[in-house]
Amino acid sequence: MSLVAIGINHKTATVDLREKVAFGPDKIHDAMKSLAASTQSGEAVIISTCNRTELYCNNCEAADVVAWLEDYHQLSHEDVEPCLYQYKGQEAVKHLMRVSAGLDSLILGEPQILGQVKQSFVKAKEAGTVAATMDRMFQNTFSVAKKIRTETEIGAAAVSVAFAAVSMAKHIFSSISTTQVLLVGAGETIELVARHLKDNGVTTMVVANRTISRAEAMCEEFGATAITLEQIPDFLPKADIVISSTASPLPILGKGMVEKALKQRRHQPMLLVDIAVPRDIEAEVADLDDAFLYTVDDLQSIIEQNMASRREAAEQAELIAEDQAYQFMEWIRSLESVDSIREYRTKSMAIKDELVERAVNKLAQGGNSEQVLLELANKLTNKLIHAPTQALTAASRQGDLNSLGQLRALLGLDKD
């Protein structure tokens, strides 16, 4: 019985199976209560994202957690078991730390997973399925993830196209927060770009999209202005940065349109990042003096360099996770020793109280005080050395020199 981590992720299971074992936000509260009750662990946390579902329990058997997962989702053992991974004790703690630091993510070092783990922990506390051990484990994990972020370069370099596009803009403009940005498209990539821009303090964004309703929906979240593709020529002269990602088969921004905008800008430089395939911006735009055009290929080379940098940082991060997981288990073991010491002291005090009470009664009945005290001392000594004497005798008879040596050290028999 120990800390247990059971899970599947993007490396072990298909999207189809990951969907089947996922826990929706509306169900995860009751699911954690059910898991804690069914496995009799009392402590349970479920992490469920698009790329992974993981179950963490304390004081339970891994087989019981697997059985609960299969029963909850009505899946056969044959379907689930080949895709599962499981960790126990220190390895379970280390795995949680690796996951939270982004070391086990699809994109190495991505920061979003830490927020998702924190949300899962909060929900578990709300469900009442977290006690002292797992509370300490998760709080330590959050500190370790922060330590890894600050002491390594795991998250310093961009490894997504969206993040790389914004990072490039930050290198070109000394103060990106004061720039005006035109985003062309309203898909997932542009939405991620908008989020990175907002995180970097950009407040003036315009989103151009073929379907205005989709652009408007996105703009609500980021406080941006929505326009149609036909309105781009009117807004382009104001844009310091243009980032485009649509599914258009033909270019949306031509050389003539950009050249006209640059004239209206009185040749203030404009950064254009085309992350669409096929291209949204005509290649000839790069020939314009004040236009700086970068394509997805330019970004990809940056991403490849940065990924190599992250892999180096990950080696440092792994050592931190290993060390911190060991330290956490040291704390767990110290709790076990505290319980043992408390139990030993309680038992010894009970023996003492019983013998003292007998001695007091004998003295009250007129017994010889010297004889009563001597009898008390002898009986107390015999009671306290009984268990160690039995252990020493058993070790000696069995020829267990290792245990015999440990017992002698424990009893202080080898001290000068």
UniProtKB/Swiss-Prot annotation:
Enzyme Commission number(s): 1.2.1.70
Pathway field: Porphyrin-containing compound metabolism; protoporphyrin-IX biosynthesis; 5-aminolevulinate from L-glutamyl-tRNA(Glu): step 1/2
GO molecular function: glutamyl-tRNA reductase activity; NADP binding
Oligomeric and partner information: Homodimer.
UniProt record similarity statement: Belongs to the glutamyl-tRNA reductase family.
Domain note: Possesses an unusual extended V-shaped dimeric structure with each monomer consisting of three distinct domains arranged along a curved 'spinal' alpha-helix. The N-terminal catalytic domain specifically recognizes the glutamate moiety of the substrate. The second domain is the NADPH-binding domain, and the third C-terminal domain is responsible for dimerization.
Identification of the protein by name: Glutamyl-tRNA reductase
Classification of source organism: Bacteria, Pseudomonadati, Pseudomonadota, Gammaproteobacteria, Alteromonadales
